[in-house]
Amino acid sequence: MSYKITVHNREQNEKTHTYEADMCEMACLRKKRTGLPVNIYVDDSGVWKQSGHANRIKIQNNRGEHPVTTDMIPMSIGEAPDILIKNPKMELSQSDINAVKKFIIANKDLLNRLGEDMDIDDFIKAMVVIR
């Protein structure tokens, strides 16, 4: 899905710029709900099917409590989850990444059903929490 976004830098009083950007709405699953050391983002609308790539989650690249959607790390969903970008600037430990992989493996079928026959509320009720 493509949206037009208008950007205006008020500090420098620059002209307004309009550009198109691909935006995919993803639901934030906070770490207190999942048991993970980081917040993660899941596609609960099935937009990934229209985008030309496989389903994935995005990992917040810090351990903060507050959701941060900049500098996210995409990870595949499957039996052997993998980071989908080369050499990311990583602020997370290998232990953090391993916990996310464990969550994906435990919930891969549910993650793939999101946006098809399962909504985010049903997912949250059924998901395996990592402790």
Give residue ranges: language-model regions.
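Detector for methionine-enriched segments
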Residues: 1, 23-26, 72-75, 90, ...
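Short, charged/polar N-terminal "headpieces" of proteins
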Residues: 1-57
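A short, structured beta-strand/loop element
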Residues: 36-98
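Short, compact, well-ordered microdomains
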Residues: 89-131
